[in-house]
Every structure is written in structure tokens, then in C-alpha cells.
Amino acid sequence: MEMLEEHRCFEGWQQRWRHDSSTLNCPMTFSIFLPPPRDHTPPPVLYWLSGLTCNDENFTIKAGAQRVAAELGIVLVMPDTSPRGEQVANDDGYDLGQGAGFYLNATQPPWATHYRMYDYLRDELPALVQSQFNVSDRCAISGHSMGGHGALIMALKNPGKYTSVSAFAPIVNPCSVPWGIKAFSSYLGEDKNAWLEWDSCALMYASNAQDAIPTLIDQGDNDQFLADQLQPAVLAEAARQKAWPMTLRIQPGYDHSYYFIASFIEDHLRFHAQYLLK
């Protein structure tokens, strides 16, 4: 591992690291915020997954999460949104390829060689964080848009791994919206049954009641992608039918930007703290 940057921030440290990923077959960067140490108890971790076109720095720089994370004693880990590099398959569109990994394991060429973000987030990155930093094994997950999709599927596919999950403007039903259909067709092929494994609505309908964890979703009602790409009401209905403890908040006037995330990130951190710090 190689440290790329380090900055003092709210008495803690904001760092950026590069490491060679055996899962993704390329070097990867991630950012981490380490709150000021309190006692000998290792702090819990909140993983943040960003959206299309982003990398590990968007949330770090724009969301303003460090102040409250420092107060609460929560480590923030921000991975990249895809594998990177000249040897990694890419596409000219912003919504496929590098910067658009969709947090799944691709099965189709040319993507399958590198695009295994799900395995990276489930196994390799948490193991690296555990081995290199003083953190507890308690963790939660959150994300925005494509990253909200990622956070939800990570939680739904891994019962017991996360204490809680939250999302801002998530893509909840990728099997049925243009962003998801384009990505899944390329990464997973034309068998739509294979897509269901990566769709949070389908996963929620298939979930067991004992695996449900507290879930918070914020969605701006002035989001230009709300009707065509996001459709949170579809997941809310699945949650209702499965008695999943999910709160969906529609925030008047807010759009899809980091101004929206910055406005409510404190709520999300305090939400996760209730369960991480038990």
C-alpha cells in the first residue's frame, strides 16, 4: 500500500491510498477518514459508495462528512467506483465502464477480467482496511445514485455483515431503468434472470424477515432522474410487503447533486451511529 495524500481534518486524518487489487487485477485507490482516537476501543466503519463518473474523492471533498464522523468516532472508507487503468475495458459513455462499475461482478467479455467490484467490496477492501488500520469489525454502508444501488445490494446480499444501510437517490430497480439495462446488458449479458441478483427490489422481495436491517433513503423531489432512473417508490413497496424497516424521505426542492448529500449527510451518520456504536 502506498499513501498518496494525508491531511489533518477535525482532529483526525483524511488519507488517500493506492494498493494492488488481486480481485480487480489493477491498482486501486481509496480514501479513508480516521477520526481522532478516543480510547482503546477500535472505531466502526461506514463504507460510502459514490455514483456514476465519480471516484473516491467526490464524497471526501464535497459532502462535508468529516466533522460529524469525527464527533461520533466513525471511520469513513470511500472506494473508487470501478477498476481503472489503460488495460481495463472502458466505454465512451459516462454510464458504462470506468467510473461506472455498478458494484457487481461482470460475467461478459471484455468486462469480466476486471469488473468485480462486488467481490472487492465484500472481501478484499474490508480485509485490507481491517489489517492496515485500527478499526472494529462493525460496519455500515451508504451511497449515492449508482452507489446507493451498490449499498443496498451489498446489504441485501450479505445478511449480518452491516448494522444498517442508507442511500441518497439510489437506483433501486436497475432491471427496469435505462442506466441499469445498459449496464446489466453489457456486464451480465442478455439473460435477465441473471440481472435479478443485482437488483435491490428483487433481492428485497426474496429476503428473509430475520435478515432485515434499519434502512434510510433520502430522495430529492427536484431530482432530474427521479421518474426515469430512480423510482424509490418501487423499493418502498417491496419494503412494505416484506415489513423491512425502511424510511423513505422525499426532500422538497432537492436535486441529484452533492448539495443534496451535504444537506443530509449528518442525518445519515447519526442514523448509522445508533447501530454501529451499540
Swiss-Prot record:
Enzyme Commission number:
3.1.2.12
The domain of life for this entry's organism is Bacteria
Coiled coil spans: none
Its GO CC terms? Answer: cytosol
The reactions it catalyses are: S-formylglutathione + H2O = formate + glutathione + H(+)
Q: Supply the alphabetized keyword list.
A: Hydrolase, Serine esterase
Q: Where is the active site?
A: S145 (charge relay system), D223 (charge relay system), H256 (charge relay system)
Question: What is a GO molecular function of this protein?
Answer: S-formylglutathione hydrolase activity
**InterPro entries under this entry?**
AB_hydrolase_fold, Esterase-like, S-formylglutathione_hydrol
Q: Where are the transmembrane segments?
A: none
Q: Which GO terms describe its biological process?
A: formaldehyde catabolic process
* Root EC class: hydrolase
Function as written in the Swiss-Prot or TrEMBL entry: Serine hydrolase involved in the detoxification of formaldehyde. Hydrolyzes S-formylglutathione to glutathione and formate.
Similarity comment text for this entry = Belongs to the esterase D family.
Q: Which NCBIfam families match?
A: fghA_ester_D
Q: This chain belongs to which protein, by name?
A: S-formylglutathione hydrolase YeiG
Natural source organism: Escherichia coli O139:H28 (strain E24377A / ETEC)
- Which gene is the coding source of this polypeptide chain? yeiG
